[in-house]
């Protein structure tokens, strides 16, 4: 089947770039070789050999012009070469299937930021992305609601498809292996260890967590993986950037999501699939799909709520009943890559029929 994917890059990074790589892997498993149009590629990835790569160079352009220029070039290439159906992970008016993994108005509101001129441009491009596409794929109900509220997208046009996770990579390990992982990371056994995976600390709520861990008397430790932190505190440790984040999920006792804006939060699902429950802010997109002992929910605007959630987590840890024995039962959807990719293929087939 002829398919095209667009994104800012095809490389091992967070968020939407990791999602694009996952789509390529899923399509490869179905013997589909897509055309991928991006600003940059990591040619050392095995996935690079599974695609027809088309690079749109934006080197030398001011940063604020790069996305509009990429959109303009992408539209011209698609029209000239009859590429498609186009699954657009980046914001572009060329999309046939527009992936909605976040909205810029939603981000600005959550972060209490006043829109600047560059934000107005981003919102305008996002509006084109969502309104011109034949279908919008929302990665959470929160994103579906924001697409309706901020961009006037009709509910009938939106398809809710929670993002996929590589179930082979993110899976539990036995107790002995987990103990070795904890030892390798030098995690204490006399404290409940909470993980924050973050490359944007303000949005991810590090300040909130730092205040909590500074004042708590519970036997706890917060470890941070991702961007370096500038906090020195006895209960907080930095683990660095991790290419083996699945082993960190397995080793810790809980993952914590305290984001001011979290359209989905794939780390929540990845953590659960590794057998590790999540302490999660109630507004996070992944809170929609975490079930039972897979989650402990708290309210971002209520410090007492976070205190209660952490106390519940520590109590379960002390009782030795915090691990998730059956991860699939702690999720409200099937996160397999195959299911997600086949859903996108179904939409692409409908695009062709129109």
Question: Which residues does each PLM region occupy?
Answer:
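Conserved donor-binding/catalytic core segment of Leloir-type glycosyltransferases
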Residues: 137, 188-204, 210-213
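Carbohydrate-associated surface elements
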Residues: 142, 164
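A short helix/loop element that forms part of the nucleotide-sugar donor recognition site in Leloir-type
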Residues: 171-187, 321
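Short alpha-helical donor nucleotide-sugar binding micro-motif in glycosyltransferases
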Residues: 241-242, 248-252
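Aromatic "clamp/platform" in nucleotide-sugar-dependent glycosyltransferases that forms part
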Residues: 260
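Short hydrophobic beta-strand element within catalytic cores of glycosyltransferases
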Residues: 277-281
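Conserved acidic donor-binding segment of nucleotide-sugar-dependent glycosyltransferases
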Residues: 292-304, 311-318
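A charged, aromatic-enriched C-terminal amphipathic alpha-helix characteristic of glycosyltransferases
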Residues: 318-352
């Amino acid at each position: 089947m002829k398919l095209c994917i667009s994104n800012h890059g095809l490389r091992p990074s967070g968020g939407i770039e990791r999602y694009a790589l996952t789509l390529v892997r899923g399509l490869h498993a179905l013997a589909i070789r897509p055309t991928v149009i991006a600003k940059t590629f990591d040619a050392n990835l095995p996935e690079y050999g599974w695609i027809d790569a088309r690079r749109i160079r934006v080197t030398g352009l001011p940063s604020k012009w790069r996305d509009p220029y990429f959109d303009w070039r992408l539209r011209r290439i698609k029209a000239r070469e009859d590429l498609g159906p186009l699954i657009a992970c980046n914001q572009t008016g060329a999309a046939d299937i527009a992936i909605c993994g976040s909205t810029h108005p939603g981000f600005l509101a959550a972060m209490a930021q006043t829109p600047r001129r560059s934000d107005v441009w981003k919102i305008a491009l996002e509006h084109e992305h969502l309104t011109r596409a034949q279908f919008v794929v929302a990665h959470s109900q929160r994103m579906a609601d924001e697409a309706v509220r901020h961009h006037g997208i009709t509910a009938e046009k939106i398809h809710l498809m929670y993002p996929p996770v590589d179930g082979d990579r993110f899976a539990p390990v036995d107790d002995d292996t987990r103990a070795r992982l904890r030892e390798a990371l030098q995690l204490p056994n006399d404290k409940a260890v909470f993980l924050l995976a973050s490359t944007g600390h303000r949005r991810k709520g590090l300040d909130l967590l730092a205040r909590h861990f500074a004042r708590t008397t519970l036997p706890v430790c917060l470890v941070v993986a991702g961007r370096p932190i500038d906090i020195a505190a006895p209960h907080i440790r930095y683990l660095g950037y991790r290419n083996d984040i699945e082993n960190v999920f397995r080793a810790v006792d809980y993952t914590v999501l305290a984001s001011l804006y979290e359209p989905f939060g794939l780390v929540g699902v990845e953590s659960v699939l590794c057998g590790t429950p999540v302490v999660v802010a109630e507004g996070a997109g992944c809170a929609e799909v975490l079930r039972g002992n897979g989650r402990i929910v708290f309210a971002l605007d209520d410090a007492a709520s976070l205190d209660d959630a952490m106390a519940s987590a520590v109590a379960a840890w002390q009782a030795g009943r915090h691990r998730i024995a059956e991860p699939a039962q702690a999720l409200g959807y099937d996160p397999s890559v195959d299911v997600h990719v086949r859903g996108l293929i179904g939409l692409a087939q409908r695009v062709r029929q129109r």
